[in-house]
Structure formats: C-alpha cells, structure tokens
Amino acid sequence: MDILATLFPSAFPALALSHFVALLSPGPDFFLLVGYAIRYRLRGSVGLCLGIAAGNGLYILLAIIGWGILRQAPLLFTVIELLGAAYLLWIGSLLLRSRPATLALHGASASRPPLVKQLFLGLGSSLLNPKNALFYLALMTSLLGPNVTLVQQAVSGAWMTSVVLIWDLLLVTLIALPSVQRRLSAVVWRVERTAG
C-alpha cells in the first residue's frame, strides 16, 4: 500500500476521472482523428494518434516543470494562442473543402499519408490547441495541489498521456471497422465539413 501512496497522489481518482471526461468531449483532435480514420483507417491514423498523445505529454511536462515560465511570459502565451487559432483555421478550411468521394473499403489506400506527416499533424493539432495547455495546467495545479511529489506528478502525467494514446487508438480502430466504414462512406465529407 505504501508504494501506491508513493506513486499516486490521493487525488488521482478525481484526476483520472476528470481527464477521461475531457477525452469524451469532442474537440479539434477528435474531429481530425475521425476524419483520418474514416479515410485512411488504422494504418493511416496511427501516427496521428502518436502525435496527439505526444503533444498532450509535452503540455503535461510543461505543467509539471515549467509552467511558471510561460505564465510569466504573456507574449509567448499570446503567440501560442495565435498560432493555435491559425492552425485550427487551416485544419477547418481543409475539412470544409471536403468533397464526396468513394472510400476504398477493400485493401489499403494508395493515398495514405506517410507516418511522419501523420505524426506532425497530430503533434501540431495537440500543441497548437491552447485549451490543452490550460486544461493540463488547471488539472495538474488545482486538482493535485501543492503537496504532491514530483514522482506523483510524473506518474499522473504518464497515466494521462497513455490514456490519450489508448483512447485515440481505440477510437480509430472502431471507426476503421468494415461495418462502420460502410455506414460512414456516404457521409464522410459531411462529417469533415461539420468538423471544419
């Protein structure tokens, strides 16, 4: 029992629940994942999942070891917010321009984006969304409190990053199922336009 108390803060159940509820609410990362999973299935979306999880992990790391610096540099935070807004507008414009297309339900898609492109798109989506930064700052500081140890913060951060990755991979896997693909093939462009 002592090892659990050493690794997990007393507020960990509340932290885990709050984090999971936040994952359930759709945001830019969710809609990007859905669009990719519909078009490219699991193989064309794994890098996106990894990038989104990495971006979340970086914000958690910032919240743990260096958020005070960013709070003391309002210009830097404003620049991040503006870059985030521009990036989200760009993704939205791509989704708004989506056109009806027939999905390749059998075999691999020839137009699947390279893994590196998926990774950077997911990382950009996650890092340039200022809501992620504010969410993790609020979660790590207010919920865990000042008495939590660095080890407990690190374990909580690793937990949340892992949950983001597992959730995103599960979502993409479910959307990539052939039965779901058949249902979504006629409306993929509408989903993308709505997301945009």
Report each predicted region and the residues it spans.
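Short alpha-helical transmembrane interface motifs in multi-pass membrane proteins
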Residues: 13-18, 86-89, 120-124, 155
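Hydrophobic/aromatic residues within the transmembrane alpha-helices of Major Facilitator Superfamily
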Residues: 20, 24, 57-58, 93, ...
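Core segments of transmembrane alpha-helices
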Residues: 85, 128-138, 195-196
